[in-house]
């Protein structure tokens, strides 16, 4: 189809699709070698790993929640993990400026970014070829999620000055169409003849009836998830602005408290991280990485950050309080510690949507498990705990795939997220014992495919109340992961699972990561599996969740387990630091000419989200 260009020689594309892909990214080349990663735990110092007769590389494991262990040990020579591709256009970086520290690097000098092939853009054939009007219709079908990465210029390959690239606006190059394919992508205008194979279009046949919508209460989601919905300001609060109510969680370097803001009376979950412990355990970069992900993410299934600031001894992340507690605890209260297949499909869909967004942002989550999934008071899920997440190397451009029907109302566009992660591999040995993928155990490096493996384990656990490869000890569990087939109990009283569900689990738990579902086109592979045929992806957050938490009073923490606190953090007595770590009352502190503040890159900001004022107003009138 001939392209239409404006006076500047730029083609046109529906503006809503541009908004869908609004992010930019960058990579900064420099040399630094990360220290040995340490074990994540509730306590205890890390120790080096050692070989065992079983041949597995070992680390010290610590009990987490249900006696499942979390492993965080560096394996081999870690590859480069470059600076996150968060947007220069993102309000957070527009306010703060680009960070000077590459938070995620655990390796040596970064390798050259892989070449990105030209993306061939094809369209439906014959009479199904979309017109300009149907392109606008296609744009309307897209569920607009703010901060979703941009298709053009997502990564930059030649930043000679070491700075991040400028804003990666969706380029106005012409949208190409042909008569021999059912895919739509973005044409890369290069003089060479490179082209990539078009992705097969998902089959949209058989979409079921729309599930009944949830009756929206005043406390349901009201956030505006658009690219302009976040306003970033200098931090407006400090430790003295909050009253501590109760400890609701703890880890090896910090604790999570339910707090109430004195001025507004709003409840928040405040993550308090000890600077001393982070230095001791070499986890500073993880805290900086988590802040960056939280501050730049804007998605209904990812926990919201409102304030970040620091005192002389602590870092503070003030986040949305999810009164439903851990999804793990909700599962434990169900008969058989499991839920029906239809309910598991709903939560698997929400997790898939969250992972799709993270992959578009260039992040590999790497720690999916029920303990890291929180239930919003509306019953929808929210992913939390991003300290183990990893940033990918510069990758390619996402390709949009439309259904065979072209403009059919039942044919929703999907996006190839795999290209955003490129061929990035990391050698870090991280994860939860029963959720670790085979390639992580082998120490051969892993990619974003580990997130789809953990999704398969999660679905299995939701259905059967246990993980599929659990052994009597850690080595037995690892051996089962590497060698055993997936067991589907069929004895009397065992859950009755459909063949489509078993098919999805089998494909997600393929031991060869290159053949695993999601290895070809990322989340689109999962979303187009027949198991999700009746799932209305664009309407998930407006549907009624299977589990709606009992609220009680907001401060009752009914859905959280009791956590014993050995040493309480005095929030109100902490001495607040300035925007870049200097004590407020003392001006710029220079402890030494060559001294470097390791927490200088932790930014103190307040984030305002459109719709929250009305939401909080209703919430606290009902308390």
UniProtKB/Swiss-Prot annotation:
Gene Ontology MF terms in the entry: ATP binding; protein serine kinase activity; protein serine/threonine kinase activity
Residue positions binding ATP: 248-256, 271
Q: What class of enzyme is it?
A: transferase
Q: Which SMART domains match?
A: S_TKc
List the biased-composition ranges (Low complexity).
199-209
Which CDD domains did the record assign?
A: STKc_phototropin_like
Q: Which UniProt keywords apply?
A: ATP-binding, Conidiation, Kinase, Nucleotide-binding, Serine/threonine-protein kinase, Sporulation, Transferase
- In this chain, the stretch annotated as Disordered covers 1-215, 569-596
Tell me the protein family, please. Answer: Belongs to the protein kinase superfamily. Ser/Thr protein kinase family. KIN82 subfamily.
Q: What is this protein called?
A: Serine/threonine-protein kinase nrc-2
Q: What is the lineage of its organism?
A: Eukaryota, Fungi, Dikarya, Ascomycota, Pezizomycotina
